[in-house]
Curated annotation (Swiss-Prot):
The keyword ATP-binding does not apply. It is found in: Cytoplasm. The gene is tal. It is an enzyme of class 2 (transferase). Keywords: Cytoplasm, Pentose shunt, Schiff base, Transferase. It comes from Methanocaldococcus jannaschii (strain ATCC 43067 / DSM 2661 / JAL-1 / JCM 10045 / NBRC 100440). Transaldolase is important for the balance of metabolites in the pentose-phosphate pathway. Pathway: Carbohydrate degradation; pentose phosphate pathway; D-glyceraldehyde 3-phosphate and beta-D-fructose 6-phosphate from D-ribose 5-phosphate and D-xylulose 5-phosphate (non-oxidative stage): step 2/3. One of its GO terms (biological process) is pentose-phosphate shunt. GO terms for cellular component: cytoplasm. The keyword Transferase applies. It catalyses: D-sedoheptulose 7-phosphate + D-glyceraldehyde 3-phosphate = D-erythrose 4-phosphate + beta-D-fructose 6-phosphate. This is Probable transaldolase.
Length: 217
């Protein structure tokens, strides 16, 4: 399974890219706004750091506006992917962009039927949101399970990006289910390294080694 980093912070992306963990990046207007920089400038810089797909979201809500923005964004780099909201106008834009060879990531997906519609429109990626479903009492990972099963049933090539990831458990379950990608904030990616027994074991090894050195004196 691929790991995407869900952030527009260039320093965070560099840090995890150096560890070989960043297969791609997803951004949205909120994340870019936090950086206080020009939108296009930030996206272009991220594309230069990461070889994999970099998702940048359109602001327009009508199909014509989305397509216009998408074409401009696509000029920034070859690895740009256009994030399009799961709406009727969004699917119209996806169909047009797909025909032009521009990759798309359909976002704000909350049901298997939405994921199926996005795939039929020609989406390269689809982003079901698990955390937000958990927030309202649903089981977010059940959505991922259903989407993966449907895509497998019909040999659909659209890749599933598990989004709205809140903790490492989401990443683990996504991998077990067979999702293609999990996109996560830096705080979650950082926790993938951790286990209390690892810390205890390392501390014990170091203590034993220190005692061994003392015994050799």
């Amino acid at each position: 399974m691929k790991f995407f980093l869900d952030t527009a912070n260039v320093e965070e992306i560099k840090k995890y890219a150096e560890l070989g963990l960043v297969d791609g990046v997803t951004t949205n207007p909120t994340l870019v706004a936090k950086e206080g920089r020009d939108f296009y400038e930030v996206v272009k810089e991220i594309c230069e750091i990461v070889e994999g797909p970099v998702s940048a979201e359109v602001i327009s809500t009508d199909a014509e506006g989305m397509v216009k923005e998408a074409r401009e964004l696509a000029k920034l780099a070859d690895n740009i992917v256009i994030k399009i909201p799961m709406t009727k106008d969004g699917m119209k834009a996806v169909k047009i962009l797909s025909a032009e060879g521009i990759k798309t990531n359909v976002t704000l997906v909350f049901s298997p039927l939405q994921a199926l519609v996005a795939a039929k429109a020609g989406a390269t990626y689809v982003s079901p949101f698990v955390g937000r479903l958990d927030d309202i009492g649903h089981v977010g990972m059940k959505l991922i399970e259903d989407v993966v099963k449907i895509y497998k049933n019909y040999d659909i090539k659209t890749e599933v990006i598990v989004a709205s990831v809140r903790h490492p458990w989401h990443v683990l379950e996504a991998a077990k289910i067979g999702a293609d990608i999990a996109t996560m904030p830096p705080a979650v990616m950082d926790k993938l390294f951790n286990h209390p027994l690892t810390d205890i074991g390392l501390e014990r090894f170091l203590k034993d080694w220190d005692e061994y050195l003392k015994s050799r004196k």
